[in-house]
Amino acid sequence: MNRLQQRQLFLENLLVGVNSTFHQMQKLSINTCCQNLQKILDLLILHRTIHSPAFRLDRMQLRQMQMLACLWIHQRNHDHLATLDTIKWISP
């Protein structure tokens, strides 16, 4: 599997994780959703680091993916204040 295929597989796994987390957490707050997304991302990055250090993601890439995931959730929740709280929670 070449680098492009591995990256595509990683992104597909991330999208599946985001999607399943959103559907499981509808009754909870957006911050809870993002905390669960953080766990998913941590596991994916740990897996990637253990199995292929060349493909490990840096902190900035992790933050960008968290932000995209939270914006994705916001688009389905339409809760502006919750999104602002989440952005503050994500920010270093």
UniProtKB/Swiss-Prot annotation:
Pfam families: Rota_NS6. It is found in: Host cytoplasm; Host mitochondrion. The keyword S-adenosyl-L-methionine does not apply. One of its GO terms (cellular component) is host cell mitochondrion. It comes from the Viruses. Keywords: Host cytoplasm, Host mitochondrion. Belongs to the rotavirus A NSP6 family. Interacts with NSP2 and NSP5. This is Non-structural protein 6. It comes from Rotavirus A (strain RVA/Human/United States/DS-1/1976/G2P1B[4]) (RV-A).
